[in-house]
């Protein structure tokens, strides 16, 4: 069956349900034992809440260690039946054995490389590895994080939800079915509920929000 992961995510979205994505940052795993330990901890934590965790993301905006990415994906595939979705920060984040990939365009980057050029370089790899591509508009919110720095982004101010909504509408009109609002790992502030609501009001696809979330209450 084609588009298995997207179909799975659509089922989560149906009825206005909210899902939590586990993100494994491969940069932190220099050895196989580190990955296996983390995999055990993650899977034990979510074994009773599988419906809340539809997929596992591997990567991150600053993840550049291709060998680490490959190691993490292979070990996670052995440990869980949950789909593994790549979240690459560059073409080095495209590795085999995953089920799908967030095929992102950093729409508010000032560097065309992150908008279309990296995608052109990575597309043949995605095809060769038979990864399910999830067309995603990646939007950096705020400034001062690794995602903002490495992506050379013109960060959308947290108090300007209509700007984010305009990008989301543009993404939808260009055929993208996913939007990711990213405050960035370690961000001092999370994406505001007002911005999420504003984007949701104009975007019909799958909306993801990350960065700066340190508690269940904030989430």
Predicted feature locations:
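Alpha/beta enzyme core
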Residues: 14-19, 26-84, 88-209, 213-219
């Amino acid at each position: 069956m084609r588009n298995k992961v997207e179909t799975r995510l659509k089922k989560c979205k149906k009825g206005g349900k909210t899902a939590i994505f586990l993100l494994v940052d491969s940069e932190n795993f220099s050895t196989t034992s580190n990955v296996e330990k983390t995999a055990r901890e993650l899977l034990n934590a979510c074994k009773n809440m599988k419906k809340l965790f539809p997929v596992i993301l591997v990567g991150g905006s600053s993840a550049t260690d291709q060998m680490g990415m490959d190691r993490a994906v292979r070990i996670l595939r052995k440990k869980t039946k949950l789909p593994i979705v790549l979240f690459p920060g560059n073409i080095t984040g495209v590795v085999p054995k995953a089920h799908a990939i967030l095929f992102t365009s950093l729409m508010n980057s000032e560097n065309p490389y992150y908008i279309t050029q990296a995608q052109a370089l990575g597309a043949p790899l995605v095809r060769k590895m038979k990864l399910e591509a999830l067309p995603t508009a990646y939007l950096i919110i705020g400034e001062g994080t690794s995602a903002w720095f490495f992506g050379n982004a013109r960060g959308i101010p947290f108090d300007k939800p209509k700007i984010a909504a305009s990008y989301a509408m543009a993404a939808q009109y260009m055929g993208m079915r996913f939007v990711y609002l990213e405050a960035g790992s370690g961000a001092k502030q999370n994406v505001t509920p007002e911005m999420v609501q504003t984007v949701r009001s104009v975007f019909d696809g799958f909306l993801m929000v990350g960065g700066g979330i340190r508690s269940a209450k904030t989430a």
